[in-house]
């Protein structure tokens, strides 16, 4: 709970800045075991080097169809036993010294941010020579995190296009397959330039080892796993909710019949 509250607090100041970014719907399915297993592999290989998942133990991965030997052979790199937490070897002090900040714990990041935000964010990095890491992000401007998946996705650059009205900008924006946002300049900012609506998109400049479709699928699996990790019992919770609603419906019918029986002789 403390990790969730902290994640929500850290996310709050960025809400206003991210409202203009169009988020893609994350095509995740927590029942897709193959997707969850692939996402777990990507998470351990690329995310767990810097980010911990301090509320998740390795043995929970048994619930997505993996056995202990598979976990030990393929996923257990930062611990000795399957029952241990998914922590990183790097201390907070080392992280601050090497990275300039402490990477957030990702245990409940999906509950704090949402699957759509994560799915769009991980597909929205672009090269920025003015950034300390050489990277920026369409969803989270001036993000401190570098693009750790760039060898897979390739290198993208930001493209700005100006339009005279919002309708033109939105018409072109809806044709984009990547994240986009529209900045609106005030008349004072625009000056004599009548094109006040700036559509910001990204395009691939240098291809990676994966095609765009393959990279989108990899990110989908990763977000699917992170969403499951934030609440491993979500399917059971939803099933229990349906049962509770069914019981309440039956009780409502019984209560109505009882009411009719009590008042049938009252005129």
Where are each of the predicted segments found?
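Bacterial N-terminal signal peptides
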Residues: 2-13
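The canonical Cys-X-X-Cys-His
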Residues: 43-54, 222
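Stable alpha-helical elements in mature extracytoplasmic
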Residues: 32-35, 42-43, 102, 114, ...
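Short, aromatic-rich amphipathic segments at membrane interfaces
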Residues: 203-243
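Juxtamembrane interface at the cytosolic side of transmembrane helices
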Residues: 237-267
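Electron-transfer interface patches adjacent to heme c in soluble/periplasmic c-type cytochromes
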Residues: 66-138, 143-176, 183, 200-215
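Electrostatic cytochrome c docking/interface patches
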Residues: 12, 16-41, 52-63, 70-71, ...
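Long, low-complexity intrinsically disordered regions enriched in Ser/Thr, Asp/Glu, Pro/Gly
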Residues: 16, 182-186, 196, 263, ...
């Amino acid at each position: 709970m403390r990790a969730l509250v902290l994640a929500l607090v850290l996310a709050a100041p960025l809400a206003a800045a991210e409202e203009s970014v169009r988020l893609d719907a994350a095509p995740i399915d927590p029942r897709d075991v193959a997707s969850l297993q692939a996402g777990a592999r990507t998470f351990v290989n690329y995310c767990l080097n810097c980010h911990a998942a301090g509320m998740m133990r390795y043995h929970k991965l048994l619930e997505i169809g993996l056995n202990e030997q598979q976990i030990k052979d393929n996923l257990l790199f930062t611990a000795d036993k399957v029952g241990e937490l998914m922590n990183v070897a790097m201390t907070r002090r080392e992280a601050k010294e090497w990275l300039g900040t402490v990477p957030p714990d990702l245990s409940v990041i999906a509950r704090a941010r949402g699957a759509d935000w994560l799915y769009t964010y991980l597909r929205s990095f672009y090269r920025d020579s003015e950034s300390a890491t050489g990277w920026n992000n369409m969803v989270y401007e001036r993000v401190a995190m570098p693009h750790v998946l760039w060898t897979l996705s390739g290198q993208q650059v930001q493209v700005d296009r100006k339009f005279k009205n919002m309708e033109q900008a939105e018409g072109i924006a809806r044709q984009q397959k990547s994240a986009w946002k529209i900045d609106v300049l005030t008349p004072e900012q625009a000056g004599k330039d009548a094109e006040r609506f700036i559509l910001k998109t990204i395009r691939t400049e240098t291809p990676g080892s994966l095609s765009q479709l393959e990279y989108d699928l990899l990110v989908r699996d990763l977000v699917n796993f992170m969403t499951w990790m934030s609440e491993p019992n979500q399917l059971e919770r939803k099933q229990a909710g349906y049962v509770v609603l069914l019981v309440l419906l039956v009780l409502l019918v019984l209560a109505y019949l009882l009411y009719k029986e009590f008042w049938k002789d009252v005129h």
